[in-house]
Regions:
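ATP/NTP phosphate-donor binding region
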Residues: 1-62, 110
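Glycine-rich beta-strand-to-loop/alpha-helix junction loops that act as flexible
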Residues: 13, 65-67, 90-92
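Short, glycine/acidic-enriched loop or turn micro-motifs at the edges of active sites
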Residues: 15, 71, 94
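Short glycine-/acidic-enriched loop or helix-start segments at secondary-structure transitions
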Residues: 20, 73-76, 99-100, 144
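Catalytic core of DAGKc-family lipid kinases
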Residues: 34, 41-43, 81-192
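Short alpha-helical
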Residues: 47-48, 69, 140
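Nuclease catalytic cores that cleave nucleic-acid phosphodiester bonds
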Residues: 62-63, 79
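Short Gly/Thr/Asp-enriched flexible loops that form oxyanion-binding sites at enzyme active sites
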Residues: 70-82
Length: 192
């Protein structure tokens, strides 16, 4: 009998509309069918995914299951390790920009199977003021909206919740920010 590989799933029980802890057994079965012995660890507060992955024992695969924020925390924690782990992501949040980048839909079980049937790829990690990010970074007028929009509104209205928050600031003046950045060794500065 072939030895099972080890997998830790770090999941955010408060992400989006679709993650239900009652389905974790189903996800575990999918992982086992793909040769993984899985352990599930739920996050309890902001920053917890970062703490969890940074203190994990060596394993074959870590899966972040949550929104963009959960994945960003997991990436940040993984970067703090000397022995980085193979990290994957299953999107379960409200917007799931990272999930869209990876080509995922809304069906968690299908996404999990796609991930486990796929191949490991490296991806770029960018850093702004010491803070890693993997998909997009922004600054300026509307950047507070994802953080200010209440979880209750997001669960009730989905994307529309962000629009509701954005309308509140739409007519306020726009401030330009001086920004310096470096890409491939070339530094640029300007007001944006």
């Amino acid at each position: 009998m072939k030895k099972m590989k080890s997998c830790v799933v770090i999941y955010n029980p408060n992400s989006g509309h679709t993650l239900k802890t009652k389905h974790l057994k189903e996800y575990k079965i999918i992982l086992e069918k793909h040769g993984y012995s899985a352990r599930f660890i739920g996050t309890e507060y902001r920053g917890h995914a970062k703490e969890i992955i940074s203190h994990l024992d060596k394993c074959d695969l870590v899966i972040s299951m949550g929104g963009d924020g959960t994945f960003n925390e997991a990436v940040t924690g993984n970067l703090q390790r000397k022995d980085r782990l193979v990290l994957a992501h299953i999107p379960v949040g409200t917007t799931n920009d990272v999930g869209v980048m990876f080509g995922y839909g809304k069906d968690i079980k299908r996404n999990l199977s796609l991930l486990l049937d796929g191949v490991t790829k490296e991806m770029d990690i960018c850093i702004i003021n010491g803070q890693p990010f993997v998909y997009v970074a922004g600054f300026g007028k509307f950047m507070h909206i994802p953080y200010q929009t209440s979880r209750t509104l997001k669960k009730k209205w989905g994307y529309l919740a962000y629009l509701i928050e954005g309308v509140k600031d739409f007519f306020s003046p726009t401030k330009l920010y001086k920004l310096s950045y470096k890409v491939n060794g070339i530094e640029k500065t300007g007001y944006y």
